[in-house]
């Protein structure tokens, strides 16, 4: 028993010990696992920090005792390492062992150390020997492979080629697995980088494969909302044309050429929600191929590892990859291709005109777009690979160190790509710049100036109809037209991108000749001198043998020369500074012996300079000095100071085509006829053409170019004291369309107020004043003057002398002084007419008018369309006043006394006006308020005696007539004609002495008076020469005024 008991006790003891040992083992295992997990976390954290800190470095670690010269390709790689951006580090064995153990990478040639991503030389050498395809390309057996390897752009081309191939549909799983390493994802990244070099030789294959992928891309895009046009365009891309491009940058520049800016995200008017939706749609439908390819590989690896491939796991991986893809990155690509397309279409026309710069600019954006597209696509793929790997590691397919390695590799490749982007873009720009240099060497002229020439040719084609019409419009036989081709953005952009901004000008000015509606191929033979020199500010058309128009069709920059200098202001920033050496005046020598028109409206005379080389802000004014010839000239001035020497002939200066403030024309100090000083206010709201310095910025990757250039703007001056001062010599007529003040000389003045409320004062001399539009005040003062109010409510004061006053439209007030012969015509509106002490013709015209003749024998006119007129004649008893009822017969007129007034009204038309002769019956003073003779259209006459002083009843006017014969009636009309002719021939002294005709054209006078008196029609209300400014006396002003009266017939 004891033995059995002892055995049981021993077994029990042993069982308890075993239980204790098991528990102890479990605790040890548990603690070990916990320690292992903790160490793994710490290791992963350390690796993560290392990647973050050193992931942008690539180091080739070589043991000091290692001899790599026997390796095929390794030795050449070491030689090229420096140019490839790989740091070579020689270490002893102990350091190498530590590095290997840091992440368990003893059997791999890529690891992560504190120095960065590390290539271990022995393992790399073995890898190159194992993969003979790679080593043969790297090694010397390929002849010039090492030299190609040393050129970063060739390496980058290879990177883009292989990744383009991957995206083109090559099985991603097989491409990665081909390395055969136990750490599949890590070696996948290494193999990917290694295979880049060998793919240089597969350029044509890559392009063809990529073309297929582009077409697939198009099919996807066609079904995406808002991308149908893009998709259809992409599907039309042909690989055959691309396959001829060869290696390097030219491969890149042939990719994705069909992408346009049709992406929904580019719609500036789209809401935020619309853009977000468009972004998801772009990710899911357009770039879905990348997500699918990477996801397929990750899922395949999970299946091999015996891990779950269920829906949730797949969704996790796919969503991680999708989030790594940024649709916005592709929008910049689309911009480049769209700009290339737009400029390319624009270039076709100008290539035919001898300029291919727009085509070069289009090529640049095409190549820049393909570079951007390639890098963006590759970076997107790499981001997707890294994101998929991270998602897989979350499912325990691989450990965190491997994930970090892959992330580091992809980040490094992306960094190399991005760093290489700038040299690639600069290479393209340099290549285009070389083409420009070759052209200039061949043709011996400035390339960009040739661009302006082409632009001008196109302008002539597009504007021919307008340009050829100027002869007829300005009534000249020939037109000399000056055009400024201003700064061109495409030309400037090409100069900026190629770094040739210092060879560019702000534009170019041209002179063209039109005659009989045709563009002359060359300068007319009679122009023996240089016609136009914008650098000196000289224009000479003095030898022209025909009437000529000189016109600045477009605004012309100020005269002078430009120079430019390109300087670097930052690592990637450059500015091409502009220096202008300007002239202070334009000098124009006009046609000597023929009439000419000078339209200076678009001449820029103000320059506001604020540039990088100016000391603060500078302002300068360019004065115009114009010497006209002996013909009858017209001058339209610009908004700057001018000096006009008109010479012989009847010359007119106009201020009505430019904006100006208060304008004062002063002839009070003139010592000769036609001499005036003019002051124009250009401040406040007045807009003027002003030359300014602007700049245009261009980006070539990171490089930014700023070009300064001259341009112009129509704007307010910004200077409260800005004025223009003109000196006019031998000018016969002046016109303006602003709020003006005209101060005449002691000689004859001809002023046009045009628009605005003007004050025109002729002072001494026989003046002709036109108010034109606006509420104007016209003062003839001394002399025999002609005053025309025009439109608006005007005040016309004839002053002393024999005057002709025409109110025109509006409610006008007309008054004359002295005792001369005057014609006062109210025109339309309710007017007030005040005669002088002399003999006056008062015609109120239409409207309700007030007519007061004053002393002297006055002549009143009334017609059926006149409205309600009141005549107040306050004359002497000896006066003989006459009232002519132009189209009325006494048979249809009732005469009635109302208080002291005498009224005439129609007896069969209640809507006709009433003519009231105020105070007809009023006595008790020395004034005579009666009209001595009242004559109807038939010549029948009523006298004051016929009506008597005791007339109270309403009577038919014809009943008051005495029995008279027809001969007597005709005699009455003849007497009126004589009276009217006397007033007209004396009012205004309309003879033109310098044309040898100081008298009156008797035949014309008799003809026009006969028309007025013998017809039943009315006086015209139009003013002399019409309402405009351009019609002037040609032979006899008297005849013109009579012609106006004739139009009353």
Curated annotation (Swiss-Prot):
Ranges: Hemolysin-type calcium-binding repeats: 743-760, 761-778, 779-796, 797-814, 825-842, 843-860
Posttranslational mods: Palmitoylated by ApxIIIC. The toxin only becomes active when modified.
NCBIfam families per record: RTX_toxin
Keyword Membrane found: yes
Localization: Secreted; Host cell membrane
Keywords recorded for this protein, A-Z: Calcium, Cytolysis, Host cell membrane, Host membrane, Lipoprotein, Membrane, Palmitate, Repeat, Secreted, Toxin, Transmembrane, Transmembrane helix, Virulence
InterPro entries, per the entry: Hemolysin-typ_Ca-bd_CS, Hemolysn_Ca-bd, RTX_C, RTX_pore_form, RTX_toxin/Mannuronan_C5-epim, RTX_toxin_determinant-A, Serralysin-like_metalloprot_C
GO annotation, cellular component aspect: extracellular region; host cell plasma membrane; membrane
One GO process term, biological-process aspect: killing of cells of another organism
Transmembrane segments: 154-170, 315-331, 397-413
Membrane topology of the entry: Multi-pass membrane protein
Gene Ontology MF terms in the entry: calcium ion binding; channel activity; toxin activity
Protein family membership: Belongs to the RTX prokaryotic toxin (TC 1.C.11) family.
Keyword Lipid metabolism: no
Domain notes: The Gly-rich region is probably involved in binding calcium, which is required for target cell-binding or cytolytic activity.
UniProt function note: Does not have hemolytic activity but shows a strong cytotoxicity towards alveolar macrophages and neutrophils.
Protein name: RTX-III toxin determinant A from serotype 2
């Amino acid at each position: 028993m004891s033995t059995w008991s002892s055995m049981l006790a021993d077994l029990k003891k042993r069982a308890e010990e075993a239980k204790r040992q098991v528990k102890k083992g479990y605790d040890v295992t548990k603690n070990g696992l916990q320690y292992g997990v903790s160490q793994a976390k710490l290791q992963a954290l350390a690796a993560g920090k290392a990647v973050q800190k050193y992931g942008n470095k690539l180091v080739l670690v070589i043991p000091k005792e290692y001899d790599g010269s026997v390796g095929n390709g390794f030795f050449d790689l070491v030689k090229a390492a420096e140019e490839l951006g790989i740091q070579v580090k020689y270490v002893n064995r102990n350091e190498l062992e530590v590095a290997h153990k840091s992440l368990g990478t003893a059997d791999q040639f890529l690891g992560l150390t504190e120095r960065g991503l590390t290539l271990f030389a022995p393992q790399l050498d073995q890898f190159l020997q194992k993969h003979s395809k790679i080593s043969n390309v790297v090694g010397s057996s390929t002849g010039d492979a090492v030299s190609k390897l040393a050129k970063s752009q060739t390496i980058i081309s290879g990177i883009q080629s292989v990744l383009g191939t991957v995206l083109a549909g090559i099985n991603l799983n097989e491409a990665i697995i081909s390395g055969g390493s136990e750490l599949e994802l890590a070696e996948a990244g290494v193999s990917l980088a290694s295979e880049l070099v060998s793919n240089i030789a597969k350029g044509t294959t890559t392009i063809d494969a990529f073309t297929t992928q582009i077409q697939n891309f198009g099919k996807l895009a066609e079904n995406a909302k808002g991308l149908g046009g893009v998709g259809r365009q992409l599907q039309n891309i042909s690989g055959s044309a691309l396959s001829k491009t060869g290696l390097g940058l030219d491969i890149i520049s042939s990719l994705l050429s069909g992408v346009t800016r049709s992406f929904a995200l580019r719609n500036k008017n789209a809401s935020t929600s619309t853009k977000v939706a468009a972004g998801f749609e772009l990710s899911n439908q357009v770039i879905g191929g990348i997500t699918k390819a990477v996801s397929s590989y990750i899922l395949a690896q999970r299946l091999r590892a015996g891990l779950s491939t269920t829906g949730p796991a797949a969704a996790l991986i796919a969503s991680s990859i999708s989030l790594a893809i940024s649709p916005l990155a592709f929008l910049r690509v689309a911009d480049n291709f769209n700009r290339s397309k737009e400029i390319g279409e624009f270039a076709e026309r100008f290539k035919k005109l001898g300029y291919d710069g727009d085509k070069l600019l289009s090529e640049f954006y095409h190549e820049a777009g393909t570079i951007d597209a390639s890098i963006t696509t590759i970076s997107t793929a790499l981001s997707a690979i890294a994101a998929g790997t991270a998602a897989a590691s979350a499912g325990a397919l691989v450990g965190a160190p491997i994930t970090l390695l892959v992330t580091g590799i992809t980040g490094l490749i992306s960094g190399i790509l991005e760093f290489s982007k700038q040299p690639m873009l600069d290479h393209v720009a340099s290549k285009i710049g070389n083409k420009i240099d070759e052209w200039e060497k061949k043709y011996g002229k400035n390339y960009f100036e040739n661009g302006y020439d082409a632009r001008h040719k196109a302008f002539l084609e597009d504007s021919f109809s307008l340009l050829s019409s100027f002869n007829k419009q300005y009534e000249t036989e020939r037109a000399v037209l000056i055009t400024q081709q201003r700064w061109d953005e495409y030309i400037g952009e090409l100069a900026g991108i190629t770094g040739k901004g210092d060879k560019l000008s702000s534009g170019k000015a041209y002179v063209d000749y039109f005659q009989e509606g045709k563009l002359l191929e060359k300068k007319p033979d009679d122009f023996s001198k240089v016609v136009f020199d914008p650098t000196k500010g000289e224009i000479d058309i003095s030898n022209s043998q025909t009437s000529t128009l000189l016109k600045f069709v477009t605004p012309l920059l100020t005269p002078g020369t430009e120079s430019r200098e390109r300087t670097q202001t930052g690592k990637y920033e450059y500015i091409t500074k502009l220096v202008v050496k300007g002239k202070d005046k334009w000098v124009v020598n006009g046609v000597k012996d023929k009439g000419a028109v000078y339209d200076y409206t678009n001449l820029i005379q103000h320059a506001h300079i604020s540039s990088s080389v100016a000391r603060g802000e500078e302002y300068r004014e360019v004065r115009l000095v114009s010497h006209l010839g002996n013909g009858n000239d017209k001058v339209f001035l610009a908004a700057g100071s001018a000096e006009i020497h008109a010479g012989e002939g009847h010359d007119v200066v106009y201020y009505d085509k430019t904006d100006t403030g208060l304008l004062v024309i002063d002839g009070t100090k003139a010592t000769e006829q036609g001499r005036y000083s003019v002051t124009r206010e250009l401040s406040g709201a007045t807009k003027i053409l002003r030359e300014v310095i602007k700049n245009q910025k261009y980006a070539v990757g990171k490089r930014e170019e700023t070009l300064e250039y001259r341009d112009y703007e129509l704007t307010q001056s910004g200077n409260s004291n800005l004025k223009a001062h003109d000196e006019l010599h031998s000018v016969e007529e002046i016109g303006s369309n602003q709020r003006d003040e005209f101060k005449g000389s002691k000689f004859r003045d001809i002023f046009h107020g045009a628009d605005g409320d003007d004050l025109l004062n002729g002072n001494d001399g026989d003046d002709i004043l036109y108010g034109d539009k606006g509420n104007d005040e016209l003062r003839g003062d001394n002399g025999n003057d002609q005053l025309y109010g025009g439109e608006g409510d005007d005040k016309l004061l004839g002053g002393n002398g024999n005057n002709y006053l025409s109110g025109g439209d509006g409610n006008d007030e007309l008054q004359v002084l002295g005792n001369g012969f005057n014609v006062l015509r109210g025109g339309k509106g309710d007017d007030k007419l005040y005669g002088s002490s002399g003999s006056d013709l008062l015609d109120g015209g239409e409207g309700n008018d007030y007519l007061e003749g004053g002393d002297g024998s006055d002549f009143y006119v009334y017609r059926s369309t006149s409205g309600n007129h009141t005549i107040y004649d306050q004359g002497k008893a000896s006066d003989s006043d006459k009232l002519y009822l132009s189209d009325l017969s006494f048979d249809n007129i009732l005469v009635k006394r109302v208080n002291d007034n005498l009224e005439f009204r129609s007896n069969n038309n209640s809507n006709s006006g009433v003519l009231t002769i105020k105070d007809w019956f009023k006595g008790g003073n020395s004034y005579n308020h009666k009209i001595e003779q009242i004559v109807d259209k038939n010549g029948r006459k009523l006298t004051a005696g016929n009506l008597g002083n005791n007339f109270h009843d309403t009577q038919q006017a014809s009943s008051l007539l005495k029995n008279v014969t027809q001969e007597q009636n005709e005699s009455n009309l003849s007497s009126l004609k004589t009276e009217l002719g006397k007033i007209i021939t004396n009012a205004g002294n309309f003879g033109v002495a310098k044309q040898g005709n100081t008298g009156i054209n008797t035949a014309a006078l008799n003809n026009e008076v006969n028309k007025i008196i013998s017809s039943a029609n009315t006086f015209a209300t139009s003013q002399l020469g019409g309402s405009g400014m351009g019609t002037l006396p040609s032979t006899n002003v008297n005849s013109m005024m009579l012609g106006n009266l004739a139009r009353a017939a």
